Structures are given as structure tokens and as C-alpha cells.
């Protein structure tokens, strides 16, 4: 409890209560050109397409109050950086928040655009970048949701006011008690997650430890052997924050996720990446042992993942192009920058790691390199957990999970098992004992076999002990802060040696067109400042160390390279 209080005290909400003072963020933004395929109808679909996430019943969220008594949805969650959605599926929900179901069973969830829609501000004008890294404080949102629901479980007056909003002044007999039981049932796993997972040193805006939270949700809340399905000791501090990646061209990478552990290349592999994501973002998922299913598990009986919606979202993401720089460009200088970009790495160039490398007709080859940057995320990939109900579960051709096994392996088996059961009819059906003797390996196709390698830990070598993906840099101007952990505010700063980079900086929507990145003055999240560490603490999660390329270029060459990166 003490840890939760510290987390809440340090929560960025206290800072975010001053958020969005810029009128530009409330006005209609300029929608940037992101290619002919990206249309207004696609945008609206992307903003509210359900993927199976279930945060909370919609009537509850509408009735919920902040500590000062104002509705939790009063500002459409703008205090956390979420963006207004005039065409939201329910009043008060921002971009990326969804509604599924009907009536009292309507559930609010989150979808891709909550974390992958960016808005920046220059001279009083806001610019919208779809598929860009969100500038949101997700940890503050999580902590404050816990803070809002907690009193309902112990304070009669608070619960009575909440229940009246939902049930009316004269609810039928038993309705109040049933609602209280449902709230407590919701709160126990959620509070367990928040109390154990959220770190003392907050992620801050524009960053989150997504991989840890996926591991924590799945192994801590979902795979216990009986309701409430909890294995609290599996939940670890989510202390390896990264910046949200941009989505344009993501479907063309042959590997995704910052350490490059998720394979890409066909619809099933894209689905695997997205199913893992939705399990981490509030999907309801409780796999169960089943001797009547060929995989020995029933992954779909209690599973809210919307496979159709996830497929549609992947199709939408493929249509998002890199945003075009909306301000003036010195074309002559940019041409000089293009020549510098094309140099070899040891000459200050970028193309050897960040150029387009055609792998086949569909994919680009994505190099994995250790460039000396923060190593913390690799540590969490090796975490061990109790496997609970999934002990003995396996993928076709694979080894069964042990009682204690890797969180990474549990995720891989759960995701592959869910998709196989959904898409391969014989694996999704119940069978008698005779039919159950059929080996699941015998029904695998060349396509479904690829699921078996959908998640693979990156190969760590002596030369590259902590590798991360080197992405194509189209649209990189719109993705600050930089490095995988968001520890460098601008591209100009990234071209300096690590020892000379700023140690701390504010985070927000104000943009610097000259330095190409976050402006030095921010108001969106009050006085929040991200404090980084140097190379002496490479595993802190906040190290600004590494990627010392182009640092020896002349000042004129650096200006030229920055100008080119604006239009790349």
C-alpha cells in the first residue's frame, strides 16, 4: 500500500492537472499529409475500431469521479494527453478509446490509436500525426483509475453516489449488492497489478514499459488455476520504459518491437504481434486446460480478443504513410544532407543501418544492432514466472512449459495457441478421446508453422550484447524523443556525444522545427521533467548513452543532415 501511495504521489496527474494550457491543442488540428491511401474514413476507423480490450463497463466509467468530485471523463482524459475525438463511440471518450457490446454490457477498451496518434504544436497551431508516438501519460492514467475506484470498495457514501448514477434512485432488490460485488471483483486484479507493476520513478509522458506490462497482465492476472486467476508474485516492476514506436512502415519490417523479437511478414504474424498487445491492454483472457482440445488447452472460452478487429486494424496501419514535413525546407541544404546520409557509418552516414534494405517483394530487412544505448529492456526478456494453468502447454513441435518458465515463452505459447485455435478448425473444436489422439503437428500448414517462430528472443552476441532494431527513418522528424527509450529530446541533441547531451528535459507537445524534436519549453504536463542517466548507468532504463554516430560531423554538415531528415 505504501508503494502505491508513492506511485500516486509521483503520478504525473498532479502535473497533468495543469495540462493542455495551449489553446492550440483544443482547436481543430491540421491533419498532415500521410499519403493518398490514408483517408478521413480510415482515420475514423483507426480511432475507434474495437480490438477486444475491456478496461471497464461504460456506465461505470461515466459514473466514476476524481478525488475532487469531478467526473473522471470531465476533460475527455486530456489531462493525460489523450486527444479529443468528436466522433467517439460514446460521449467523452478520446481518440483510441472504444466501446463494444450493448446496453449495460457496453465495455470501454483501448485500441492502437490511443498510443499511436501524435499531436504537436508550433506557434499556436496543432498538427495531427496519425500512427505517430503518442504524447500521453499512461502511467498516470492507470494510477488514477485505481485511485478513483478504490474508495468505492470501502466507502459507503462514495459507493452509494456511484451506484445511484448507474442504478437510479430506486434500484431493484439485490442490485446494489450485485454491483458492489462486481466492482470488487474488477478492482482486486487491477489494484494488484497497479500496486506491484508501476515503478516509483514514473515513465512520464510519451513512454511506457509495454513489454513488462504485457508480461505482468498475462502471467500475473490471467493464468492462475482458478478465479480470480491471480499469481501476484509474477508481477514485476515495469521499469524499462521505451518511447512509443511510429506505425508507418511497421508492416514492412521483417522484425518489430524494439529488441526485434516479433517476426513480421504475413497476416498471421501481424496478428500474433497484435494479440500479444491486446492481452496486455485489458483483454479478458483466461486459458483453461482441456483434454478435449488437440492443443490440450482451451484458449478461447474466456477470451475477448477481437480477431476480426485486429485484422482490420493491421490493414489500416498498412495505409498510414510517413507524415510530410509541413513547414519550409531549405532544399539546397537538404540535398547536401542526403549525401551525408548516404555515407558509410564511420564517415558520419546513416544509410548502412537506417536505409531501406529490400528483403523480398514485401518486407524490408531490419538490422538489430547494439549501439551502446540503454540495456534495461533486454533484462526483462529473461524473466521467469510461475506458469499456473499453462504448465504443460506447448506449441506444435515445441516443448511443454515447465512449472517455472520464461514469461517470454508463456506469451509465445498463449498467443500462438489462441490464433491456432481460432483459425485452424480442428484445433478449435472439441473432440472425443479417439479424435483427441490426433497430433496437432499433423494439421499444421506452411503458413501456420510460421506462428511457431512469431516470438523469438534476439540473438545476443559478444559484438552485439544488447541489440535493438534499426528502423528506416522515414518520418523520423515526428517521433521525438529519440533512442528507443526516449532519452534524447531532439535530433540535434542526438548528433552530440552522449556526455554532452542534456541530462534532463521537459516532455510535451511543443515542437522545435530547428532542432527537430521537443521544444525546450513545455506547458502540457506542468513542471514534469524527464531525468536521464549517463553511460555509467546504462541499465537504468533512462540512460541517454549510445548511438554516437554523426557526432564528429561539422556544424554545417549536421545542419544539412537535419534538413534532410525533415523530408525523408
Where are these regions (language model features)?
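N-terminal secretory signal peptides that target proteins for export/translocation
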Residues: 1-6
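Intrinsically disordered, low-complexity regions enriched in polar/acidic and amide residues
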Residues: 8, 17, 383-385
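Bacterial N-terminal signal peptides
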Residues: 11-22
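Periplasmic c-type cytochrome electron-transfer domains
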Residues: 27-568
